[in-house]
Amino acid sequence: MLKLKDVSELGKHIVVQGGTMRNDAVVRALEQLTGAQVIRCDMPELMGAFGCAIYAREHCNTLVSLDEIVSQAHYSTHLLHCKGCDNQCQVFRYHFDNGKNYYSGNRCEKVFTNGSKEQPGENIYRFKNELLFGRSKTVPEKPRMVVGIPRSLNMYENFPFWHTLLTACGIEVRLSGESTYSGYEQSARMVMSDNICFPAKLVHGHVQNLIAQKVDRIFLPFVIFERKGKEQNSYNCPVVTGYSEVVKSVQSSGIPIDSPAISFKDEDLLYKQCSNYLKSLGVEESQIKEAFAKATEVQEDYAASLVAHNKQVLENARQQKHMVVLLAGRPYHTDMLIQHKISDVLADMGIDVISDDIVRENGQKIENVHFLAQWSYPNRILEAAQWCAAQGDDVQFVELTSFGCGPDAFLVDEVRDVLIRNGKTFTLLKLDDINNVGSMKLRIRSLIESMKLFHEHRAGRKEQNTAVAVSECKDHYKNKKILVPYFTPFISPLIPAIMRLAGYDVENLALSNAESCEWGLKYANNEVCYPATLIVGDVVKAFKSGRYNPEETVVAMTQTGGQCRASNYVSLIKKALEEAGYPHTPVLSLTFGSSLENKQPGLKVNWIKILPVALRAILYSDCISKFYYAAAAREKEVGQAARLRDDFLQQAEGLIRDKRSKDLLDLLSVAAEQFNAICRDMNCPKVGVVGEIFLKFNPFAQKNVIGWLTEKGIEVVPSVLTDFFMQNFVNRKVRVESCIQKSAMPDFVYKSAYKIINKQIGKFNKAGMKFRYFIPFKDIFEEAADARKVISLNAQFGEGWLLPAEIMSYARQGIFNVVSLQPFGCIANHIVSKGVEKRIKYFFPEMNILSLDFDSGVSDVNITNRLLLFVDHLK
């Protein structure tokens, strides 16, 4: 795949080759996309063969013809059938008198491989596997119990710690077997999300393996933070953190699955978490202290051994003048099934293989990148890329990534840029459950050969600038136009008025459209989540329109700093603006958090002044949305509800601008009466809508699913923005109780704030009840209590536990039909939506959930067909 942002880089004449280019439609599509003349010979599929022939002729050193070689050769032919897979290819083996064999007919190189045998290189991954899992098999004399640990995900990072901790507490540890394809296939039916990464899919097989071993308990910790260096944060991705919740939902074997919340970022908190868990198993405090100290030491020794061995391999390779490949990936890419033994393939070619673990103790700060360093494993990969970029040509970089890996949609482009800016090549191998070693070998051989040519031509090549353009703008925001993405028809119209009170000139971008998709795909990685594609596209589209002066305009974007990919939107927009030709346009971060580092600092807002206004505006807009959707399904004349919605939002904007936000309550009472007047007295089928926050509120992003349902006479019961913010009171309480964080303020401060806000919610509930179809706001702690039955409240990534809480709340109201709107491949919703669907249906068997995934290429027909089937179920 060719990622091209500026077609002029290709020139006016383009020559294409390869079998794909025999397709006239492909060639014509390229002409239309580039606007250039595309030239193709009559045999494009043979151009590579011609190239090989020309290369061979230029390097020939004998005058023996091909016919002479064949006539002088003495060989025997044997017909074989390969048993490497179900294809059972017919393979011919040619055995020559000198003892060598040549195979033909094989469609891959899994079993029968041609090529000379080289002295194999060192493979750090074999050493790492043994160092990780080759622990003492000594079993406590009288074990308290047998705890099984799946050989999966972050156990490839922390197994030495957990094995030592549990064993030292008198608990026998049983590890699941090595990953096998048969184990994966037998448990594939348990995978709740088809597009989740392969490493996650393997977890079910490992859990089944432990169930078969009849362990007493299974240990799958809910690890939120890994150990932190100089990076901004050290989160795990939502899949690594929360997959235990999916396992609990689908694998009910009667064996308890323990998933205590864990943070390796703070050793004091880590001890409390371990202590609380072990005490629940009957372990004494004195034994826990000793075991914890020992486990910490063993984990540190493991990390130090990895670093030392990597450095030793590198030193030996340089002494022997061997090529070295830094094969980077997540810790679980150490699993030979996940990586398809790529490290062995490299080593068999005589290459010495090291891993990203070589930078574990570097303490190197990630610089000159458009990337929020929030995830632990990607941070290490990026540090390794920076380290590799500073090395000589004898060290090259290859990255392993799994299909469906959310963070890598941001990471891969930055790794590529870091290497290319420093004159290094970048090779990316994308892995899933399909084993295609032959294709990967070809890419690796291509890398090696290209490096030989690279060395030959390096002398005349100029190094590229390593600087990343960052525009800082500290004091002039109030004199500039600030653009913000369009979010929802209900709160977005009020945002400029709210920010005007803070002294800022804020303007909403236009609602996304098909052009936004095109610009977004051009300037963002095509695997980022759909909302990111649209937001980047909206921003670039605005500047390309010529309506805004990039020197006098600023872009602002919210930033949560959590485990979700949305925290990287600010970096993504910066990168897009730079590549689109607007490097001096600042991008501001709107955040309450202090853990986010942004060289373009956030707005200085007097939140004490603005928050009461913002709260009233959010509550008012949520109430109007409740009025609108209930009335739209019952309106006496088509369009009445929409006109009232727009009218009352416009009036609210005027009140806010006039600093009369307290009058919103009176205006809401008037709105309730007028919405009552346009409604027919009738019952309608009801559908709840949940999902990713941008999709469920933005009409274009969801392809107007909510509008489609309303047109069918269905009352949509919407999610509300209020709950999204109110969940922070629950989140903070849960994080402190789970020892994920220390309390920064006394509890009474939060309790007082909660009471003040809850009182305001009560006032809006009272005014809203004047509309006869109004459904009042629920208490967020009551919703959390329902959610706790199906998922850990530490699941605070993406929509977090709030999404299943909303579904449970609908069920309590008698609404058993719910549409869940998700970006395709959303890593958070793999856990909090599809992942716990079975658990929700355990409590409410009649619950009917339709999950719809969206991206820029989703079929309108497919969405409509699925909605039609869903609507039929309502009748």
Locations of the language-model features?
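Phosphate/ATP-binding catalytic cores across multiple sugar-kinase/actin-like superfamilies
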Residues: 1-11, 803
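Glycine-rich phosphate-binding loops at beta-strand->alpha-helix junctions
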Residues: 7-33, 44-45, 154-155, 332, ...
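Hydrophobic/aromatic-enriched cytosolic interaction surfaces used to assemble or bind macromolecules
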Residues: 34, 48, 57-58
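PAZ/PAZ-like end-binding module
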Residues: 39
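An N-terminal assembly and electron-transfer interface module characteristic of large anaerobic redox
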Residues: 42-43, 60-875
